[in-house]
Amino acid sequence: MRRSGNGGAAKKKKKRSASAASERRPRADGGMRIVVPLQGVVQGRGGLVLGSLIPCALFYFFQLYIKRNRASPPPPPGSPTAASAAAVSPIHRSLSRGLLAPRAALPAISARGASVRDDDSLYYAGLRRCAADPYHPVTNPSGIIQLGLAENYLSLDLVGRWMEEHAAEAASMAGGEDEDERELSIRGLAAYQPYDGILALKMALAGFMRQIMQGSVSFEPSQVVITSGATPAMEILSFCLADPGNAFLVPSPYYPGWDRDIKWRTGIELIPVPCRSTDNFNISITALEIAYNQAKKRGIKVRGVLISNPNNPTGSFVPKQTLHDLLEFAAEKNIHLISDEVFAGSTYGSGKFVSVAEVVDDLEDFDKGRVHIIYGLSKDLSLAGFRVGVIYSYNESIVTAAAKIARFSSVSTPTQRLLVAMLSDQKFISDYLKVNRERLRKMYHLFVDALDQVGIECYKSSGGFYCWADMSKFIRSYSEKGERKLWDRLLEEAKVNVTPGSSCHCIEPGWFRCCFTTLSEHDIPVLVQRLRTITDSHKPNH
């Protein structure tokens, strides 16, 4: 019995040794992983029949699997079926289906992209709604009348006539009968040029801006950076002046596009500083001081003050004394002053427009390096589609940095050459500015009178393409919500798109920006009729 016990123990030990050896044994290749289990099947309890059939069946399916999945030999060179065989290979089809199959969700959009995607305002919502159903007296008389877009159609005929007469000549510029001259001309158009604008256009723009200011101030071409519109000009300048998390103080109401133009990619905050109707929406230095101190307490670094002159949306000029006060405030706080003057040449009021450049020139011992101007040709020359903007800065470091960033926002050379010719045509420019101002003045008064017919009063404007209309007596609830409901009714029932004051950060409900330069005189009666459907149905709330 003792031997038997020892023998059993020996067998168990031998079995454990064999098992351990099996674990230490290197893995077999692919064929052995199939054959070894088959051996167990043949020797199993199923008998000879099962032990024979099952291995044969498994072996058959294994061979079929290999045959179907191995690559076929390539066709001989020159074979007409070589390309087609590769195109219809089962493996290629299998991979294509696998790549195209919607097995998982798409990669996530960035947080920055998501914030842009989700950001919106009634200003842009109205523009989109109008673009989808624009009014036309013949082709779409029931469409939406556009009063939300600051675009000038009043003088397009003047620009169009000049283009017809001079565009071909301007495009060739240095071209002539000589072959070398023609080659030089095409090189000047097709080759790379400075991203911040060619010198000829900088000189022409400096002269045009001086003409806009009626010769009261001169501009240096070396301080000009040209961009593809005033929007990128504003963004590039902001990028150079402030860091993410910094802020600009902005007297409000202000142009609603700045919330996108400045904040989206730079990460700079805009702090509205309310101006009130009781003060004629004038900028208050006291209010700026309070806003600056509040931002400082919250740990926000204020890097500048941003204004528009003429003001957008009120259409008023910033008084010369206020510009002096703003410069003193900027110097005291050691911050920048940015003046958006894109409507400087689109004036029609009795007052005189004064650029911050004129005020700076009058000051002695003042550091001009904190003063910057935004300009463009979209408004004063009705060339919005040409996409030409200007950064004018007295700060050499800002000019250098902005010129480098302008590579992402450069204007095409043919466009620049064409504009050099146009701006150099002094007779055309003088005639255009004179006629355009007359047409603006006439349409402004027609528009204000039309609104007055339906009981809507307008703040007195001196420049720009719009009037600042007070519709507060037509909102049922004196609140932003009540303003929103009136805006909805104007858009959906009257088919008129306007910009609500809340989009401009106006703290007084019921103000709306109404642009009049996309209208013709024949559109005015239609507008009056549509507005009556809203104003006549409202019982004034005060």
UniProtKB/Swiss-Prot annotation:
Region (Disordered) location: 1-28
Cofactor(s) listed in the protein's UniProt record: pyridoxal 5'-phosphate
GO cellular component: amyloplast membrane
Phenotype of the disrupted gene, per the record: Enlarged starch grains in endosperm, spherical starch grains in pollen, decreased number of chloroplasts in leaves, enlarged chloroplasts with increased number of starch granules in leaves, reduced number of total panicles and slight reduction of seed weight.
SUPFAM superfamilies membership: PLP-dependent transferases
GO molecular-function terms, A-Z: lyase activity; pyridoxal phosphate binding; transaminase activity
Physiological role: Catalyzes the formation of 1-aminocyclopropane-1-carboxylate, a direct precursor of ethylene in higher plants. Required for the regulation of starch grain size in endosperm.
The name this protein goes by in its record: 1-aminocyclopropane-1-carboxylate synthase 6
Source organism of the structure: Oryza sativa subsp. japonica
